[in-house]
Regions:
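Small-residue-biased structural context
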Residues: 3-155
């Protein structure tokens, strides 16, 4: 007999294709996927809004730290598309902030927001992050120690 327990299916699965070859960044991306799935699971389970909004706040904070780490790495390696990449980060932060404010006002997080999180992160990793990772790994030896030192400061 069924116990009434609903197992939520993850909104976003981590896939090998998301691995960039920068261990620290890959781990942070896995954490972002995990946070998105925690929010999704909280929605599916009809958790209290305070739980859902706390998770969104956690996602916002983690994302800001992650973006700062990525942007520092890009600056340190003189990544030529830095401004464009940083703008993508800023647009993401603005959209999440807007959606969160709307959700707090209405008491409901839109499914569009969840799909946006999943789609944006997947595409951003596969396209934009892949470009800067490939760029920074071209001078791998020189940048590895730089990258390790950088991430000890952030995480």
């Amino acid at each position: 007999s069924r116990t009434g327990i609903c197992m939520a299916i993850a909104l976003m699965a981590w896939e090998e294709k998301f691995c960039l070859g920068l261990d620290e960044i890959d781990e942070q991306h896995k954490s972002l996927v995990d946070l998105i799935n925690q929010i999704w699971e909280s929605i599916i389970k009809k958790s209290d809004n305070s739980v859902i909004f706390a998770l969104i706040g956690e996602l916002e904070k983690y994302t800001l730290a992650h973006f700062a780490a990525e942007e520092t790495l890009m600056r340190m390696t003189d990544y030529p598309a830095f401004d464009k990449h940083k703008k993508e980060h800023q647009d993401f932060v603005a959209r999440v902030s807007e959606e969160k404010a709307q959700a707090e006002a209405t008491g409901q997080l839109s499914l569009d927001m969840m799909y946006f999180l999943r789609n944006w992160l997947g595409e951003h990793i596969l396209i934009s992050d892949k470009h800067y990772a490939d760029y920074s790994l071209r001078n791998k030896k020189e940048n590895r120690s730089l990258i390790s030192r950088l991430f000890r400061r952030f995480f």
